[in-house]
Structures are given as C-alpha cells and as structure tokens.
Design a protein with these regions (language model features):
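Long, charged all-alpha helical bundle/coiled-coil segments in cytosolic proteins
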Residues: 1-6
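Extended, charged alpha-helical coiled-coil/arm scaffolds that mediate oligomerization and mechanical coupling
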Residues: 7, 12-42, 46-53, 57
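A short, ordered amphipathic alpha-helix with a cationic face
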Residues: 7-15, 107, 129-130, 143-145
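Active-site-proximal, well-structured secondary-structure segments within enzyme catalytic domains
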Residues: 12, 16-18, 45-48, 55, ...
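Short, charged/polar, low-complexity loop and linker segments
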Residues: 24-27, 117-120, 226
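A conserved hydrophobic secondary-structure block that centers on an alpha-helix together
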Residues: 28-42, 122-155, 163-169
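Active-site-adjacent "gating/activation" loops or surface patches in catalytic cores
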Residues: 86-124, 211, 215-221
Length: 239
C-alpha cells in the first residue's frame, strides 16, 4: 500500500494521509478478514437497533387528557384547536408532538399538570426501548474493543478535538465548573419565582424550592416575560 512506503509528505498532504489511514483503521480494514466481518455485523446490528429505537418513539401515541382548569395559563387559542379539544372539558395533549408538549411545559401554571405530561413524555416507548438501549450499549462496547479502543467514548472522540474520552470528560467538567456561578444565580431567580407560587402571600425566609425538570421551562418563560417582556407564544406566530 502507498502508506507502507512511508512517503515524505508535509502539510495538508500529510494530514490527508494520516486521517485517511485513521479512518480505514476505524472502519476495521486493518483487522483480519474474519474479525473485520464480525465488526461489520456488529455495526449492522447497532444500526438496526438504532432505527428501531427511533421508530418506536415516533410510532408511540401517548395522549394525556386534561381539563381546562388543569391547563390554566395556556393561551386561549390552544383550547380551540380541533386536535386538542376532544370532548366536553377534555383537552388531549400528545406528548410526542413537540409543539404541544413544549407549549404546556412553558405555560401551564399547575406543577401537577407539567409533571404528569413530562413523565409521560420521558417514558415514551420505555418498555420497548430500555431493552434495546441495553443491547445498543453492549454492541457499542464490543465494536470499540474489537477495533482496539478501550471504550466507545475513546472510539467516538478520536477524530474530534478531544481525541479520547478522558479529555472529553475533563472538558465537560471544566465547563460545568466555569458556568456554575452563573447557573447558580439564574437558578436562584427561578427559585424565587417558584416560592411566590408556593407561598403566594409572601413572607418567611427564602426556602430555595427545588426546580424540577418539569419546572424550568415554565419559570424560564415567566422570567422572560417579566424581565424582557418576551412572549414566547406570541413569537410562535412568526415561525
């Protein structure tokens, strides 16, 4: 092969050769035929499971029915949409329809409503997909090991700036540490808003109520309205 002649290349030519040889190795071309075929089969299995995983989510229709009172805070035109109003004081939200899910999470005043919808959304196709996910993780590890990597993390990050999983994790850890003060300040603002909902009469010490995963969109949206006069629902009309 050309690479075996160890050509004296420089600059872009050297970079092109190195990256081409790396990609060949990542594809398994340096392996004996039997092991290369095994990696190819593992990759096909992984791709098939990935497609099945996404299809399961796309095909799962998870309707969650609320009363109008439970959806207090939603813009009035939400209730008039034919796909939403499905009965006498019955309003059906499909959690796999992104605009419906986000609209409720951003605007519904009731934490119980937001929580119920979020859990349904986070559980889409769970019974089918959790076993698939475990299989996919196993296949990823097998592929990485067959190709000579310590882990899937190292395999995935090799062609990127980080080069390995440990460096990528350090970057994330450093990033988290760097933004922590700003994050803490913004979180406190959301907590103050939630405390007003928990203790509407005010008074008492600041208790820093927990901002759950079904809370942040709502309080962030309220903060935008109060501080910047940004109405997310009104903006949707332009997109």
């Amino acid at each position: 092969a050309f690479a075996d002649t160890k050509p004296q290349l420089e600059g872009e030519d050297r970079k092109l050769l190195n990256e081409t040889m790396r990609d060949y190795r990542r594809a398994g071309l340096a392996l004996p035929p039997a092991k290369r075929k095994e990696v190819e089969q593992l990759r096909k299995q992984l791709a098939k499971l990935g497609t099945e995983f996404g299809t399961n989510i796309a095909n799962t229709k998870e309707p969650v029915v609320f009363t109008k009172a439970e959806l207090d805070g939603m813009p009035e035109d939400f209730f008039t949409k034919p796909e939403i109003k499905t009965g006498d004081d019955a309003y059906t939200v499909l959690v796999n329809v992104t605009w419906q899910f986000v609209a409720v999470e951003e605007n519904a005043k009731s934490e119980a409503t937001r929580k119920r919808l979020y859990i349904a959304h986070d559980s889409l196709a769970k019974d089918k997909n959790v076993p698939l996910l475990n299989q996919m993780l196993t296949l990823r590890n097998k592929i990485a090991l067959r190709l000579g990597y310590k882990s899937w993390d190292d395999f995935q990050t090799e062609p990127r700036m980080a080069k390995n999983g440990a460096a990528a994790q350090k970057y994330i850890d450093d990033l988290v540490a760097g933004i922590e003060p700003k994050f803490a300040a913004e979180l406190t603002e959301l907590q103050k808003m939630k405390q007003l909902d928990v203790q509407p009469q005010g008074g008492g010490a600041f208790t820093a109520p927990r901002i759950n995963t079904w809370d942040w969109r709502y309080y962030q949206n309220q903060l935008k309205k109060q501080k910047f006069a940004v109405d997310t629902e009104a903006l949707r009309n332009f997109f």
